[in-house]
Structures are given as structure tokens and as C-alpha cells.
């Protein structure tokens, strides 16, 4: 039976390849994710290992012992006076201090703008270059800085900006931007790329001045004399340093601590694997459908095997072997495709300025094993039901014409099973969303299982819905086909004219030249122009989809040019023929047959549509939820901000120097300038965002919704007093007059008295849970920086006013002024960019479903070869056959859309209800939903191109004899 299975696959190479392709994309996503994250992990591991290679003990500020939003809170600096005391210890061979900051040092590009890093660190270093053993950087050109006006920068920035040793480079820090002489170019150890991150390194005194570390260091590295262990050295150091202000660690302890900062790679891994799982899940539907159709088409073959003695177990083994080989083939291709995908993803991150440190390609044994295992297991599980179905073929079917498989004993109960699964899915989703005491992992598991069961339940129920849905969407499909035909008609006429000019006989030279020239104009100019206009119009429904269509039109133009060249080559070789004149009019017979064909086998149509349904449901879910969040975000900001302008960082999310706010506050046009600083602290036992406000001005530019207090509460805010938001007050049972403690990152604890309680929007509050006065904030926090500055101007916002404010910020290129409306629009753009990334990743699932539709149509054409031959024999033209197959595909796609779009909206409504406490609104983006339906219809048309072409070119006599 192994030989039978392998010969069967060899005889159906195209079907086997298309089936394997359904698993390739999912496996590629899995292997690509592992390869990419392994490259990133190795790079970070190399960075940390090399940074502390010669360090036996490491001294840093006392860790506050808490995290905020998953990130370690930066410890305070240490006194530089510790360094001489450490150097005098008997077991110390060498010690050196370091100044380091990862956010405020911005290298300015040649256009005068700060280099954007997409959220990656912008390091500023002060290094003792006389102790090279502790220097993690490696020169690639020039020398190290020795004077206050000298700097060395990273090789990536130097290459991107064409900076060379001897150039003048401007750098912005906590001080106004100033020029430095570039004396060196360096890289981080042996790591060739640190991603989008940048660094500028100075002398220690210069760094202390630029980064506000007067008399302070961020760390001290110490090496021991030969024979002294790291533990002995740490013990000795602890005897001469203030342990209430510093931490002393061994090299191993410090490397472990540093690696916590790279834990975000796990988030990237799980994020990408989620979409890989979705693609694999959709692929499983495609494989199930393909193998089911294949089994149905091979009834006589299986019956013959049964007749000559094959047992049911042997048939089960044969089909399972086919599934195994297809899965293994798909997994192997997917593994190698994943390596290319990892390189592509890294290039994509770099293109959007968000690349991460990486090393060379790493294909770990774990990656190979998991990729192959997933591909084979998913295919075997998906092929189990068709394999079992094959065992039920009776031997007598070998001599019957048109024999079909008997219905299973459980078939009558499937609708009830489907309804039960849908009910179970709703229960799981409700449990995951509304249960209050669930751990995050359990909640996510319940939601994931709920979605999985819901999709399976709807897929099992959909065969009952197919006949009704087919009748409903058939008229839509008819008009869709007319619209598509009209849009592509100039292209088709151009192709017909061009082929006529090449191949037609009995025409004059002038007619031939006219046909060739006219065909080329229609084919390469007018046709693509009409397609481009249609794609451009799609931008008004969905910008992302519109641009995707525009790219598709460009690709189409390239394909058409290649087709023209190949057609000329074929003509020179004496091959080819003139095609039929393409038609446009409605064809009632074709229209009716296409609808009947989709209803002929509801199970097959439903399984094909289910794959597209899942992809569309997820895209719709994300679009509706994201649009609700975007609207909630916009309204939350509009409720809070009263000022005309916002002063923010150039990249929109970093902090900015307080000096920038002070500079713009002096502008003649500014009536009110209110700085807002931000930090982290442990308030009443829990970690919260702490903001510093200007008591005299904040109420003029920020709208407080007071629950207990008035604007006077903050106007008179003094030291050891705070205003808090209502959510924090309710959680900690606080009210006006209550007292609570605040612990800062320096480890100091202060008592605070509540002077007012206000209600902040739960979605995107601009102030922290606890707010104190600016003077008091500056006392508690090292190097305080502005989160943003609210600006109200005389006479309202205008272009001239903004130009004047920008001139006042000339020394602070890392800050920018935006109107209130422009700043809100920028927040919307961030949502749109993230949504675009999700669309790109979910496109894999849609592509897999497209492969499934192609597969089903190809197999359907094989199965109906005699039927198609009969239709041709009784007068149906090639164009009619082609149109019938295309319309079948569009009907199937519309059924998938009719199921997927409402399902996605339903899931989004559930999640929105669960997020009601955050004021997330339910606002379906109707234009986007229409665009998704159009995409589904176009997917149906594209999926039918090759099958329709094959069906229209069947030889009539051979088709009538086909078995």
C-alpha cells in the first residue's frame, strides 16, 4: 500500500503540491519566527556577554525592586566618590566608572532632524577609555574622544548618514543641541548590527555634564586580581560601599539581570506564532477539503483495491501515507521558506526603522524538529476524516458508474453537534472575558479555545446554510462578474487584438499593424490605467487595501509586459493561436449553472468557504475592535486637552528636556505653558505612573472632571500633597484627606495627602494615577524630564504662530510642536500603522484560503471533466465555461464573506463589551467592511483564473471519454 500511495501522489503532482502549499505558509511562519527570534536572542546574548567579559564585580544604583508595564525601573546613579574607595581595595586589579543613558541622547542627521529609531534605545555613553578591558565598544575607524567637544558614534549611524571621521556631528542631550567633532566610529563588540539603536560616546566628564550626572556614575566595573573569586571580590566591595544605595553583583548575576531587558523577544515570538497558528488552522481546513474531494473522486480506484483483496486498514494506511508525505513535503518547503521569511521580516523591520540587533542565520535543531512535526501532525489530523471515509468504499462500487460514498452514521447528528459547539464557544468566550479572578494565561487560553471551537462549530453548521446563502449571493456574484468584466475588458480586448495581430490569417499588413499597436495600447496603457483608477478609488474605503491593490496593478503591468514578450517569442517559433473575442453580456444559463454547482455539494462548498471565513472573521474582528479603540482614544484626548498646541518629542513617545518647555514658554505668542513630567513610583503598595504638574497653569489647559475637589485643589497643591484619579482612589479606598505612601526609584518613601479626586478617561489617560506639584516632583526624581507641554497661545492656533514656536525650538530638534488636532491625528496614525501590521500577518491566512479555493476548483474541474465536455458538445462556448467557473468561485467567496464578516463583528462586540470598563466603543468601520467584502470577491475571481482557463480549454472528445 505504500507503493500504491506514492504512485498515487506521483500521478497527481499538481494536486499534491497545491495541498502541500496550504501547510507551507503556516510552517514557514513558525520556522521564520524561531529563526528570527533566535538571531535576536543570540545578538543580545553576545552583547551582554561581551559587555561584562572582563568584569568580576559590578556596582550600580540600588534597584527599586519593582517593574512598570513589564519593564525594569531604571535604578538611580551612584556617587563617583565610591570609585577611589573601590580601587584601593587589596583584591582589586582595576576599576572604571561608566555613564550611560538609553533615551535622551539623539544624534542629528544631515537634514537637521533627530535620527528616529522606532522605539529602540538612543544610548549616550561616558567611558573610561584608559581601561579598555571594561569598554564594550570596538573602534572601526578613528580614535576615542579625549576632549569635551569630541564624540564617537556607532557604525550603523555613520554609514546611514555618510558621516566620516573629522566631520561635525550635532547631538542633542538633556542640554540644547550642540556640535561635536567626530573622532571615532565604533561598533558594539563583535555584534555587527545593533538594529535601529544608536549610540554616541563621550569622555566621562563630558557625559556627566551633558546627561546631568554631575559627580555621579551609572555603574562601576571591577576586575579581581588573579586567584580572587568573584564572590570574594563582591564580599570585599560590600564592606566599603553604602549598601542602602548600591547593589553589588558578580558577573554572572549582572548578565542575568541585564538579560531581563531582552525579555521582549518572547513577546515577539508569541505574537508571530499566534498568526502562524491561524495560518495552520486555515490550512487544516484546506487539507481536509482537498483530501475529501480526492477520496470522493477515487471511489472506483479504492473499490478496485477492495475487490482485489485490500482491507479497510490498508486503505486507511494508504490515504494516511499520502497525507504524511504531503505534510512532510509542505513542512520541508515551509522550513526553508521560513528561513527566507526571517530574512524578509528583518528587512521589513529595518525598512520601517524598527530593526533589532541580529547575528547570522541560526537554524536550531529545535526549529527543524518543531517545523517538521507541526507540518506532519496538522496534515495527518486534517486528513484523518477523509482517510476513514475511504475505508467505507464498498467493493461493488468498482463496477458502478457514478458511485458515491454512503453517508456516515453520525451525519444526521452533525447539525446538533455544530450547535452544541457554538454554544460551548460562546460560553468559553464569556468565561474568558467576564470572569474576574482568572490569571492572564487562563483568560487567554479560554479566549483562544472559544474562538477555535466557534470557528469549527460554524464550519460544521455552514453546509446547512450553503443552499440558502448561495441563492442570496448569486445575484450579487452576477453583478460582480459584470463589474470585473467591464474593468478588465480593455485589457482582455487588448490581448485579443494583440493575438489577432500575431496569429490571424487573411488580414492585410495594415490591419495586422493596427491590431498589434491597438492591442498594445489597450493592453499596457488603457487597461492598467482603468485598473489603477479602480485601485485608487479603493483607498477611500481602506487606505491599506487601496495601496495593496495599487501594488497589485503594478505587478500586473509587469506580468502583461512579460506576456507580450513571451507571445512574440511563441509566434516566432510558429506556435500559438488567435483567441475568441471576449464577451460582456449576461448569460442566464451560465449564471444558473454556477449557482447550482455550488449547491450540488454543500459540504465541499462550505469547507472551501470556511477557510476564507476564518481569515475574514479575524480581519473583521481586528478592524472593528481597533476602530472602536481609535475612536475611544480620540474622544479621551479631546475630553482632556484644552490647549491649542502640544509640545512633544519628535518621535511622539520619548520624553523631552525640560529646557525645551522653558524655551517655548518664553515665546511672545504663548499665553500659557504647562509642563508635565512623568516617573514611576510605588504608591500605596502598587506601582503607578507619577506625574508632576504645574499647579498654577495645569487647570487652564487640562480639563479635570472632579469627583471630590475643584480646580482650587490643584491651584494650591504643595509638597507632600497629591491629586489622584478615581480608579486609583476606589482601588485603594482613598478620599480627600486620606494619606498614603510613595516610594521613588531611589528607594526613598514619602507620605502624601490626597487633596482632590478626579475622573480620568480609562482609555488613554494623559496624567498618571498620582499627580504632585512640579517643584516637589523635581525633588523626588533624578533628572526629571517632560512627558509633554500643554501650550495655549494668544489668538488661537495659526501657521505663523506655529512657525514662530518652531523657531524657538531650534536648539531642541528632538522636540516638536503640534496643534491639538494634529497630535490627535498622530495618535490615530499609530493605531493605523499597527493595524496595517496585523493585516499583513493575517494576509497569510487569507492567502492559504485562496490556495484552498484554487485547489477545490481545480479538483472540481477534474471531477466534472465529462460534464464540461458535454456542455461544450451541446453548444457552450469557451467563454461561457470560463465565466461559469469564475462565478462559482465568486459565489463561494461571497458565502465565506457572508459568514466571516458577521462572525468577526460578533467577536468584536463581545470583546468590546468585556472592555466596557475602559470606555472602548463599538464602532464598526463600515467602509473597511465593504472593502473586505470586495477583497473576498476579487479573491474569488483570482482563485478561478487557472481553473477557469483549464476548463475552457478541455478537448471536447477527450472530455466525453474521461473516467
Where are the predicted features?
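Membrane transport/envelope proteins' first extracytoplasmic loop
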Residues: 2-281, 293, 351, 355-359, ...
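Interfacial "coupling" helices/loops that link adjacent transmembrane helices in transporter permeases
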Residues: 8, 12, 276, 283-327, ...
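Short cytosolic juxtamembrane segments of multi-pass membrane proteins
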Residues: 392-407, 952-963
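Small-residue-rich transmembrane alpha-helices
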Residues: 324-355, 367-392, 421-436, 458, ...
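C-terminal transmembrane helical bundles of large multi-pass transporters
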Residues: 598, 605, 609, 675, ...
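Alpha-helical transmembrane segments, especially those used as permease/efflux helices
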Residues: 11-18, 236, 242, 267-270, ...
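Hydrophobic transmembrane alpha-helices
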Residues: 24-27, 271-287, 324, 332, ...
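Juxtamembrane segments of multi-pass membrane proteins
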Residues: 65-67, 73, 464-467, 471-481, ...
Amino acid at each position: 500500500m505504500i507503493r500504491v500511495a506514492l504512485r498515487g501522489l506521483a500521478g497527481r503532482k499538481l494536486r499534491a503540491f497545491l495541498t502541500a502549499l496550504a501547510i507551507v505558509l503556516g510552517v514557514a511562519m513558525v520556522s521564520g519566527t524561531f529563526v528570527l527570534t533566535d538571531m535576536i536572542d543570540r545578538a543580545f546574548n553576545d552583547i551582554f556577554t561581551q559587555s561584562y567579559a572582563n568584569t568580576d564585580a559590578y556596582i550600580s544604583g540600588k534597584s527599586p525592586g519593582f517593574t512598570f508595564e513589564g519593564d525594569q525601573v531604571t535604578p538611580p546613579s551612584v556617587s563617583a566618590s565610591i570609585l577611589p574607595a573601590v580601587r584601593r581595595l587589596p583584591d582589586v586589579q582595576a576599576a572604571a566608572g561608566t555613564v550611560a543613558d538609553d533615551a535622551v541622547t539623539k544624534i542629528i542627521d544631515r537634514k537637521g532632524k533627530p535620527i528616529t529609531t522606532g522605539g529602540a534605545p538612543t544610548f549616550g555613553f561616558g567611558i573610561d577609555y584608559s581601561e579598555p578591558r571594561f569598554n564594550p565598544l570596538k573602534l572601526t575607524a578613528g580614535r576615542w574622544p579625549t576632549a569635551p567637544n569630541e564624540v564617537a558614534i556607532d557604525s550603523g549611524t555613520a554609514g546611514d548618514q555618510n558621516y566620516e571621521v573629522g566631520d561635525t556631528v550635532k547631538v542633542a542631550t538633556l542640554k540644547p543641541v550642540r556640535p561635536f567633532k567626530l573622532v571615532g566610529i565604533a561598533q558594539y563588540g563583535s555584534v555587527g548590527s545593533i538594529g535601529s539603536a544608536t549610540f554616541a560616546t563621550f569622555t566621562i566628564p563630558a557625559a556627566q555634564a551633558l546627561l546631568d550626572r554631575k559627580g555621579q556614575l551609572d555603574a562601576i566595573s571591577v576586575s579581581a586580581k588573579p586567584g580572587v573569586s568573584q564572590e570574594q571580590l563582591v564580599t570585599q566591595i560590600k564592606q566599603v560601599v553604602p549598601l542602602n544605595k548600591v547593589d553589588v553583583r558578580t558577573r554572572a548575576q549582572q548578565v542575568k539581570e541585564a538579560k531581563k531587558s531582552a525579555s521582549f523577544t518572547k513577546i515577539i515570538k508569541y505574537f508571530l506564532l499566534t498568526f502562524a497558528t491561524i495560518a495552520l488552522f486555515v490550512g487544516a481546513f484546506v487539507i481536509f477539503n482537498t483530501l475529501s474531494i480526492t477520496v470522493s473522486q477515487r471511489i472506483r480506484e479504492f473499490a478496485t483495491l477492495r475487490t482485489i483483496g485490500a482491507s479497510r486498514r490498508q486503505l486507511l494506511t494508504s490515504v494516511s501515507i499520502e497525507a504524511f508525505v504531503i505534510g512532510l513535503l509542505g513542512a520541508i518547503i515551509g522550513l526553508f521558506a521560513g528561513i527566507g521569511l526571517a530574512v524578509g521580516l528583518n528587512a521589513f523591520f529595518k525598512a520601517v526603522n524598527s530593526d533589532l540587533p541580529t547575528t547570522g542565520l541560526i537554524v536550531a535543531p529545535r526549529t527543524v524538529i518543531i517545523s517538521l512535526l507541526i507540518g506532519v501532525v496538522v496534515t495527518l489530523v486534517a486528513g484523518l476524516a477523509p482517510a476513514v471515509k475511504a475505508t467505507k468504499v464498498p467493493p461493488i462500487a468498482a463496477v458502478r458508474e457514478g458511485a458515491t460514498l454512503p453517508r456516515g452514521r453520525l451525519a444526521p447528528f452533525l447539525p446538533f453537534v455544530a450547535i452544541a459547539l457554538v454554544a460551548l464557544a460562546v460560553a468559553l468566550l464569556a468565561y474568558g472575558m467576564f470572569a474576574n479572578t482568572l490569571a492572564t494565561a487562563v483568560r487567554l487560553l479560554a479566549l483562544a479555545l472559544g474562538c477555535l471551537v466557534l470557528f469549527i462549530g460554524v464550519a460544521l453548521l455552514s453546509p446547512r446554510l450553503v443552499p440558502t446563502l448561495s441563492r442570496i449571493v448569486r445575484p450579487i456574484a452576477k453583478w460582480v462578474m459584470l463589474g470585473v468584466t467591464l474593468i478588465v475588458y480593455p485589457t482582455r480586448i487588448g490581448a485579443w487584438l494583440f493575438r489577432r495581430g500575431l496569429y490571424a490569417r487573411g488580414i492585410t499588413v495594415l490591419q495586422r499593424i493596427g491590431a498589434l499597436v491597438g492591442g498594445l495600447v489597450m493592453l499596457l496603457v488603457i487597461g492598467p490605467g482603468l485598473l489603477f483608477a479602480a485601485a485608487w478609488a479603493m483607498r477611500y474605503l481602506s487606505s491599506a487595501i487601496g495601496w495593496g491593490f495599487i501594488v497589485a496593478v503594478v505587478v500586473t503591468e509587469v506580468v502583461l509586459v512579460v506576456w507580450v514578450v513571451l507571445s512574440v517569442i511563441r509566434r516566432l517559433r510558429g506556435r500559438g493561436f488567435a483567441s475568441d473575442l471576449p464577451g460582456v453580456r449576461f448569460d442566464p444559463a451560465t449564471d444558473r449553472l454556477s449557482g447550482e454547482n455550488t449547491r450540488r455539494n454543500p459540504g465541499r462548498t462550505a469547507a472551501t468557504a470556511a477557510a476564507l471565513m476564518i481569515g475574514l472573521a479575524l480581519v473583521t474582528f481586528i478592524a472593528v475592535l481597533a476602530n472602536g479603540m481609535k475612536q475611544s482614544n480620540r474622544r479621551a484626548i479631546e475630553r482632556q486637552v484644552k490647549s491649542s498646541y502640544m509640545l512633544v518629542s519628535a518621535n511622539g513617545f520619548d520624553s523631552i528636556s525640560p529646557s525645551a518647555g522653558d524655551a517655548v514658554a518664553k515665546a511672545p505668542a504663548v499665553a500659557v505653558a504647562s509642563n508635565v513630567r512623568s516617573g514611576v513610583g510605588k504608591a500605596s503598595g502598587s506601582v503607578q505612573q507619577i506625574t508632576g504638574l504645574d499647579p498654577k497653569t495645569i487647570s487652564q489647559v487640562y480639563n479635570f472632571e472632579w469627583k471630590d475637589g475643584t480646580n482650587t485643589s490643584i491651584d494650591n497643591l504643595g509638597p507632600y500633597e497629591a491629586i489622584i484619579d478615581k480608579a486609583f482612589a476606589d482601588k485603594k479606598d482613598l478620599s480627600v484627606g486620606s494619606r498614603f505612601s510613595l516610594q521613588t526609584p531611589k528607594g526613598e518613601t514619602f507620605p502624601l495627602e490626597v487633596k482632590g479626586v478626579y475622573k480620568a478617561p480609562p482609555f488613554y489617560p494623559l496624567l498618571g494615577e498620582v499627580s504632585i506639584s512640579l517643584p516637589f516632583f523635581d525633588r523626588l526624581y533624578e533628572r526629571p524630564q517632560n512627558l509633554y507641554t500643554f501650550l495655549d497661545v494668544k489668538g488661537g492656533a495659526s501657521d505663523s504662530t506655529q512657525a514662530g514656536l518652531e523657531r524657538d525650538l531650534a536648539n531642541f530638534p528632538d522636540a516638536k510642536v503640534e496643534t491639538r488636532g494634529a497630535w490627535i491625528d498622530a495618535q490615530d496614525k499609530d493605531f493605523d500603522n499597527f493595524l496595517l501590521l496585523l493585516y499583513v500577518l493575517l494576509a497569510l491566512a487569507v492567502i492559504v484560503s485562496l490556495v484552498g479555493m484554487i485547489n477545490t476548483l481545480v479538483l472540481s474541474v477534474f471531477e466534472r471533466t465529462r460534464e464540461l465536455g458535454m456542455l461544450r458538445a451541446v453548444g457552450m462556448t469557451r467563454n461561457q465555461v470560463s465565466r461559469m467557473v469564475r462565478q462559482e468561485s465568486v459565489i463561494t467567496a461571497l458565502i465565506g464573506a457572508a459568514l466571516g464578516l458577521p462572525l468577526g463583528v460578533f467577536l468584536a462586540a463581545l470583546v468590546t463589551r468585556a472592555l466596557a470598563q475602559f470606555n472602548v466603543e463599538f464602532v464598526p468601520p463600515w467602509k473597511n467592511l465593504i472593502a473586505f467584502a470586495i477583497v473576498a470577491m476579487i479573491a474569488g475571481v483570482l482563485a478561478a483564473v487557472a481553473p477557469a482557463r483549464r476548463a475552457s480549454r478541455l478537448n471536447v472528445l477527450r472530455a466525453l471519454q474521461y473516467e
